[in-house]
């Protein structure tokens, strides 16, 4: 699954259709298997007789029981025919053991993403999402990856390291990934992910590693109360030791951490939020921290810091403090940058809510998701397109819901923001755009666009194609040439909860060509209230308090 940043009304657009969908039953294992599998019916009644050095063994259904050493087949005249019956079953078994992609089925990838910003010999590596229940860290890393312009220096961002755990709102589906960097068995499901991020950390250009976390309460060197004490991790800059050998870039870890903490403490929202440096003195015997990503980086001779925002905060406030700390370290590393939002809790929240979108079928279907309805029904899509969906943020994903074939869930971090019920269609690629007259002017609208309409729009007829405006009930099969006005659409068919976005779909016979969206005068839209879309979920605390 890829992601891409899209302009607010830019290219990427898709929608659903009126009428009942073409229902396709989800395939079972039997229907997914090669066509020779039905021959099993003949094979079930066959009997093979085997003899070993110890005794003869009778087997049914190719299941051998009892001691078998050197089998000798009886009924030699029927041996080849019986093997011919069993061989397809063996092939079927091997086929089912192949990776999904090798069988030609949809493979929904949740590998982590590395976004490379800027170009310089020395790189700052920023990692978010190593624990899936810490949305402040992976949300901040997402904004760094998508809303910052690196003008001097280089920054590599991994915003979604433990993507499956992010989606499932879990600290770790297979245990705590941040405790797998000292040693890890190859049988661990996360072995490939851990090895890949270790390779990235060891990259000769990487000189500084920042690992973003959400920690409980407020770290204090001395006990103050149950929220503010040495067992807490929130609002701290973590170092594993005081420093690295002379000559290591930013190797004076304690000094660098103190400088950044002092800088961020100049712009606290409340005095309670003050940052402190927390030296875990890992090499002195902290067995848990010895397994962490940051200590792995230190052992590779790289300056590394853990940045902890408090879990007591909503996600936008956590991300605000994360970005404040990250910017402090970037400045100290000589990185110059610009961002396109204000570094305030409100500005961060607006940036996280903005520019949410997903594109399917090579951009012939685009859905803006900032105010999307909880369910989008009968969205025409070709089979296989959900696994290749393009999202606007790297912590967004399109995955099957409960029914693999009938429902798709769009995730934003650890929230599901909408559910799509697809209408699976064959695609027609012979048309790229349609001609329209919108508010008296003619335009050519490519599929995947959002078209702003003040009053009226007409789609020009195109020979061989028909138009279906979703929510506009004309009683005609082809709605090209008809005036389309906001008042003529049933609001419940809109893509957004505000009732301003409507799908216009184009078909050639039964094949789907593409769609674009009509956005009617937004100033007349009702405001949708009371729905949270930001990734935000307080995670369960570990016994260590983070």
Regions found by a protein language model. Name each.
Residues 2, 27-33, 40-41, 54-57, ...:
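Acidic, Ala/Val/Gly-enriched low-complexity intrinsically disordered segments
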Residues 8, 49-55, 74-75:
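Low-complexity, intrinsically disordered or signal/transmembrane-proximal segments
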């Amino acid at each position: 699954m890829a992601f891409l940043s899209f302009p607010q009304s830019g290219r990427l657009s898709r929608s659903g259709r009126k009428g009942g969908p073409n229902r396709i039953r989800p395939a079972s294992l039997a229907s997914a298997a090669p066509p020779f599998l039905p021959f099993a019916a003949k094979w079930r009644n066959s009997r093979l007789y085997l003899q070993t050095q110890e005794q003869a063994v009778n087997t049914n259904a190719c299941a051998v029981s009892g001691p078998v050493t050197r089998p000798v087949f009886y009924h030699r005249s029927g041996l080849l025919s019986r093997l011919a019956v069993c061989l397809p079953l063996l092939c079927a078994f091997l086929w089912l053991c192949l990776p999904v992609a090798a069988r030609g089925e949809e493979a929904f990838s949740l590998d982590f993403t590395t976004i490379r910003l800027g170009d310089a010999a020395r790189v700052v590596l920023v990692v978010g999402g190593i624990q899936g229940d810490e949305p402040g860290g992976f949300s901040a890393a997402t904004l760094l990856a998508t809303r910052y312009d690196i003008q001097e220096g280089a920054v590599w961002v991994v915003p979604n390291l433990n993507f499956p755990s992010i989606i499932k709102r879990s600290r770790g589906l297979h245990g705590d990934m941040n405790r797998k960097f000292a040693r890890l068995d190859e049988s661990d499901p996360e072995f490939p992910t851990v090895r890949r991020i270790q390779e990235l950390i060891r990259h000769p250009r990487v000189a500084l590693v920042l690992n973003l976390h959400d920690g409980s309460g407020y770290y204090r060197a001395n006990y103050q109360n149950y929220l503010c004490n040495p067992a807490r991790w929130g609002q701290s800059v973590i170092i594993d030791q005081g420093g690295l050998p002379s000559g290591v870039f930013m190797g004076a870890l304690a000094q660098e951490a103190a400088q950044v903490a002092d800088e961020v403490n100049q712009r606290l929202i409340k005095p309670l939020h003050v940052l402190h440096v927390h030296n875990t003195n890992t090499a002195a015997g902290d067995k848990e921290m010895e397994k962490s990503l940051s200590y792995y980086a230190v052992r590779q001779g790289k300056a590394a810091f853990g940045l902890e925002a408090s879990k007591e905060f909503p996600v936008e406030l956590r991300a605000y403090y994360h970005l404040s700390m990250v910017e402090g370290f970037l400045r100290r590393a000589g990185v110059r940058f610009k961002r396109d939002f204000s570094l305030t809790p409100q500005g961060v929240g607006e940036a996280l809510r903005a520019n949410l979108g997903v594109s399917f079928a090579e951009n012939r279907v685009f859905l803006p998701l900032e105010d999307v309805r909880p369910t989008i029904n009968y969205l025409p899509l070709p089979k296989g397109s959900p696994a290749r969906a393009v999202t606007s943020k790297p912590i967004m994903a399109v995955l099957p819901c409960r029914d693999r074939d009938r429902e798709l869930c769009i995730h934003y971090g650890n929230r599901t923001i909408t559910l799509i019920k697809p209408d699976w269609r064959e695609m027609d690629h012979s048309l790229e755009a349609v001609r329209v007259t919108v508010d008296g002017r003619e335009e050519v609208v490519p599929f995947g666009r959002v078209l702003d309409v003040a009053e009226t729009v007409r789609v020009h007829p195109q020979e061989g194609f028909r138009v279906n405006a979703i929510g506009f009930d004309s009683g005609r099969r082809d709605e090209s040439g008809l005036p389309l006005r906001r008042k003529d659409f049933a609001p419940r068919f809109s893509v957004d909860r505000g009732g301003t976005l409507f799908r216009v779909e184009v078909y050639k016979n039964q094949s789907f060509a593409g769609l674009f969206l009509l956005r009617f005068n937004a100033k007349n839209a009702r405001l949708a209230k009371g729905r949270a879309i930001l990734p935000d979920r307080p995670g369960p605390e570990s016994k260590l308090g983070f």
